[in-house]
């Protein structure tokens, strides 16, 4: 920490110590300190008394520049008590009839009033009241559309929502409040929106980056937003020339979300987009093990590890929390071959914004 010294020196008018003294401000570099007395200094052969004030100056603050597209990002523009009220424009089931559960893709109007970015989330406040007679609390959902929306006019926002229905320990069928509210919405219905929120999952700025996306189920939402911007849109300030590699894990092939869209992207940019599905109830690896997302990744383990050593590789993980441990297990053994502690290395990646996780 830098120090600044201001010295006030009291000197007699002459060499006589009986004469009055005067105080002068003297530059520190002109002072010669005498060992015989901490209070005395000599200036041009004259002895005087010094009073010095030492102040410290805080070091200049280092401004951290994010590697992500965070310029002018907006968060929490709309709160639960004053949400934005949009309308449902489109609500379509995107899973097959034999899929274990329903997933819906929905588009809401925003009229440009909810300025979100790829990788952010919005909150939804479902209609009605809870068992205590209070309004329902908001639920957060990852945005499934790019910043300009599915219609390309920056006036809509899209979600990918799985209908939650389960049987509790008492044998009662329980329906998730918000997911069922959303999946049942009809075009024209009003929907209360909060946010946008989140900076963890923002896209990298570098258009030449390697972006590895690991998603399960509706965790595909932020990656759809990334990939639309990369391959379906034209931007003057962004043209993706790197590698986007998507791993998507689902239980059945009828649960593969946005499959046709992703295949079109791969056809359009085969050198820049790689696509790998892991269908756990239908596929197995060469050991006969079910094909979970980490099982599929293990087939490319060495290649993935080499990519993770580069400072322009960014990993994004979104979906079920269970996949995180499976992926760590793969990386632990790979890193160990190079004498690297994976958990410590992952901390380094997180600090560098290269390992980004949003699981539930």
From Swiss-Prot:
Any matching Pfam family: NAD_binding_1
Keywords: Chloroplast, Electron transport, FAD, Flavoprotein, Membrane, NADP, Oxidoreductase, Photosynthesis, Plastid, Thylakoid, Transit peptide, Transport
Main location: plastid
Keyword Lyase attached: no
CC terms in the record's Gene Ontology section: chloroplast stroma; chloroplast thylakoid membrane
Catalysis: reaction(s): 2 reduced [2Fe-2S]-[ferredoxin] + NADP(+) + H(+) = 2 oxidized [2Fe-2S]-[ferredoxin] + NADPH
Region forming the signal peptide: none
Keyword S-adenosyl-L-methionine applies: no
Outcome of swapping residue 360 to F: Results in a 2.0-fold reduction in kcat for the diaphorase reaction
Binding, FAD: 139-142, 160-162, 166, 177-179, 218
EC number: 1.18.1.2
Outcome, altering residue 360 to W: Results in a 2.2-fold reduction in kcat for the diaphorase reaction
Domain FAD-binding FR-type: 81-203
Physiological role: May play a key role in regulating the relative amounts of cyclic and non-cyclic electron flow to meet the demands of the plant for ATP and reducing power.
More info: FNR is probably attached to the membrane by a specific binding protein.
Name the UniProt record assigns to this protein: Ferredoxin--NADP reductase, leaf isozyme, chloroplastic
Organism: Pisum sativum (Garden pea)
Name of encoding gene: PETH
């Amino acid at each position: 920490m830098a120090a600044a010294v201001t010295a006030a020196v009291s000197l007699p008018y002459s060499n006589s110590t009986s004469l009055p003294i005067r105080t002068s401000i003297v530059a520190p570099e002109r002072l010669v300190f005498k060992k015989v007395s901490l209070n005395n200094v000599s200036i041009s052969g004259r002895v005087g008394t010094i009073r010095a004030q030492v102040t410290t100056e805080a070091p200049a603050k280092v401004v951290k520049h994010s590697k992500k597209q965070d310029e002018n990002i907006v968060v929490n523009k709309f709160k639960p008590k004053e949400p934005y009220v949009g309308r449902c424009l489109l609500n379509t089931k995107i899973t097959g009839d034999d899929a274990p559960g329903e997933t819906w893709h929905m588009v809401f109007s925003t009229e440009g009033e909810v300025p979100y970015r790829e990788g952010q989330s919005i909150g939804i406040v479902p209609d009605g009241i809870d068992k205590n007679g209070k309004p329902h609390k908001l639920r957060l959902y990852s945005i499934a559309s790019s910043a300009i929306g599915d219609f390309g006019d920056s006036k809509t926002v899209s979600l990918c929502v799985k209908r939650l229905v389960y049987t509790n320990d008492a044998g009662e069928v329980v329906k998730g409040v918000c997911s069922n509210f959303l999946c049942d919405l009809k075009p024209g219905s009003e929907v209360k929106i909060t946010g946008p929120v989140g900076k963890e999952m923002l896209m990298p700025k570098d258009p030449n980056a390697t972006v590895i996306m690991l998603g399960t189920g509706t965790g595909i939402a932020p990656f759809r937003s990334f990939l639309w911007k990369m391959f379906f849109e034209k931007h003057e300030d962004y043209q993706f020339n790197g590698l986007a590699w998507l791993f998507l894990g689902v239980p059945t092939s009828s649960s593969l979300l946005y499959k046709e869209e992703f295949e079109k992207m791969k056809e359009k940019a085969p050198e820049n987009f790689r696509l790998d599905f892991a269908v756990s109830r239908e596929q197995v690896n060469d050991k006969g093990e079910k094909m979970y997302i980490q099982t599929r990744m293990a087939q490319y383990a060495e290649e993935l590890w080499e990519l993770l050593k580069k400072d322009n590789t960014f990993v994004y993980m979104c979906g079920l929390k269970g996949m995180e441990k499976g992926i760590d297990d793969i990386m632990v053994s790979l890193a160990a071959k190079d004498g690297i502690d994976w958990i410590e290395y992952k901390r380094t990646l997180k600090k560098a914004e290269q390992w980004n996780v949003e699981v539930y």
